[in-house]
C-alpha cells in the first residue's frame, strides 16, 4: 500500500511543474498593487529564484483556502449606496413597475382578474371579480363585496387584469436614466 502524500509533498509536486506558480489565500488573482498585501498576510509572491528556497520555508509561505494566516480582508460597514429601490411617496420606485406595485397603487378599486390554470381538468381558466385588498410579489388578495369571500390568488396563474375605472399609475419618467451607447 502506497503512503499518502502530505500537503507539503503535494506542493513540492506542483513546484516541479514548469512555469506553474501557485498562489493560495484570500485572493488567488492579485491585482495591481496587492503584492505588499500578500506579504502582510504571511504569503510571499513566488519568483523564479525563490522556488529553490521554498523547501526551506516549509508550509509557512503557503496559505490554503479556509485557513487565515493573520491579517485578512474586512468588509466595509456603513450605509449602503442608494439605488433603484428608493421610493417617492405616491410614485413607484425607479424601474420597479411590477404588477404588485401597480396593484398596490390601485388598492380599494374593483378589478376583474383573468387566470389560467394549466393542466387543470376542473377549471382551465377562471375569472375573479373583487376589490383589491393587497398584493405581494407572488400573490393578490381580493374580496368579493357581494359574498364577503376573500381570495388569495397566485400571480403565477395571472393572465391579465381589467378595471372599471381609471388606473392609478405614475411612472417616474424623469428619474429613469439610460446609459449612452
From Swiss-Prot:
Cross-linked residues, Isoglutamyl lysine isopeptide (Lys-Gln) (interchain with Q-?): 2, 4-5
> What upregulates this protein?
Expression is sigma E-dependent.
Q: Which GO terms describe its biological process?
A: sporulation resulting in formation of a cellular spore
What superkingdom does the record give? Bacteria
Gene Ontology CC annotations of this record: spore wall
Biased composition (Gly residues) is annotated at 58-73
Query: Where is it predominantly found?
Result: other
Among the Pfam families in the record, one is: Spore_GerQ
| Sequence ranges of Low complexity compositional bias | 30-57
Cell compartment(s), UniProt: Spore coat
Which of UniProt's keywords are assigned here?
Germination, Isopeptide bond, Sporulation
Q: Outcome of residue 4 to A/Q?
A: Cross-linking not affected. Cross-linking not affected. Cross-linking eliminated, but still localizes CwlJ properly
Q: How is it modified after translation?
A: Three N-terminal lysines form epsilon-(gamma-glutamyl)lysine isopeptide bonds with glutamines of other spore coat proteins.
State the residue spans of region: Disordered.
19-89
Q: Write down the InterPro entries for this protein, in alphabetical order.
A: Spore_coat_GerQ
NCBIfam families tied to this protein: spore_gerQ (TIGR02728)
Assembly, in brief, is:
Multimer. Is cross-linked by Tgl and YabG into an insoluble high-molecular-mass complex that appears very late in sporulation.
User: What task does this protein carry out?
Assistant: Essential for the localization of CwlJ in the spore coat and for spore germination triggered by calcium and dipicolinic acid (DPA). Its assembly into the spore coat is dependent on the coat morphogenetic proteins CotE and SpoIVA.
Put simply, this protein is called Spore coat protein GerQ
Q: Where does this protein come from, organism-wise?
A: Bacillus subtilis (strain 168)
- Gene name? gerQ
